[in-house]
Amino acid sequence: MIDSIKFSDEFNKAFKKLKKRYKSLPNDFLSLLHELKENPIQGVALKNGMRKVRISFASKNRGKSGGVRVIIRLTVSETCLSFLYIYDKQDMSNVAETFLDQLIVEMDNNSNKIN
């Protein structure tokens, strides 16, 4: 059961940019958030407890394959869900592992927490 959620600064910046381009993103993201709270083990497993989850959204009129990717991380205890980064597959096919590792370090040092 997820009891806390964190957002990296990079996630917040990228989300804000994507929100300008895709008006349905906030609602589509809320749907994903509810799904992840129920079952956080979704998407493709990456290293260090990270996962890449696909979102389809109404603004693009496409399925998940052409949509947005969200990189999340579960803590060892699996009670905290961290949103590391969000990107449009159209703009970027993958995110560098070194960039994701840097985001993990920054998130571990900062506490940008909501409950």
What are these regions (language model features)?
Residues 1-31:
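Arg/Lys-rich, positively charged N-terminal/basic patches that mediate binding to nucleic acids
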Residues 5, 23-26, 44-47, 65, ...:
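Non-catalytic, surface-exposed connector residues within folded enzymatic/regulatory domains
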Residues 28, 32-37, 42:
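Negatively charged, low-complexity tracts enriched in Asp/Glu with abundant Ser/Thr
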